[in-house]
Amino acid sequence: MYQEQRMSAIVEYLHTHRTITLDEICDMFTVSKDTARRDLVKLEENGEVMRVKGGATLSSSHIIDYSERTPTKAKEQIAKEAASLMSEGYDVLLDTSSTIALMAEYMDVKHVTVITNSIDNVDLLDQYTACDTFLLPGKFNGKNRNVTGPRTISTLQEYKVDQLFLGTCGVGADGITSPSEEEAFLKRQMIQCARQVIMLADHTKFEREFLHRVCDMSDIDILITNKEPEADVKEKIEQNQVRLIVTDFDKGEETQ
């Protein structure tokens, strides 16, 4: 198979599986690691993938729009667990995330004050009359159905909330990352105004690294996911005393 054919197949694979390793490329095409690495280098030069440790992921320009992402059983389990952590009378901040948007389905009609930059969160929470919801000001982003920008940042600086429910694109041993500089900056400000940071991340977000750093693992208080992270990430979680909740219904595990 020619290099161009392999490269096309790799990109097609990534649209379904999100990440690919050098070993997987070697097995798929019966090539050496050097050949697999050259394919990824070429794809990165073309702007189609982003190389990460031991493989590659889709570049930010190829990441599926927020509006096109569909709920999965894993995300529903994570959202249900996250909603159970809300308490009566809390002031909470909700990030823009397809998983966080699902939390509205599992809220037990608690009287909480919600601040968010997500249009979908506002729409979904409208069903709860006991919930006071505030949409942050800013520039509308049609791709992610949220508001961002300097006005959003400056308004966040006026708040101190009990809980932040944070979404993410990449989780690794070195911390949390995002493909968007603007998104990373916004998330950092959200973290600064929260007493407790709860991150929601399904297993596809692990071992993915992007250009812009959001925060260190030490900035997270609770991490909710659906599968046990790899050893290096779990070690970092334990070192920083992050409460890890694994919602895999086959295991029902929780690590503190």
Give residue spans per PLM region.
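Amphipathic, positively biased hydrophobic alpha-helical segments used for protein targeting
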Residues: 65-66, 93, 100, 178, ...
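HTH-adjacent hinge/linker in prokaryotic transcriptional regulators
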Residues: 2-9, 13-23, 28, 33-98, ...
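Conserved phosphate- and dinucleotide-binding cores of soluble alpha/beta proteins
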Residues: 2, 12, 19-25, 123-256
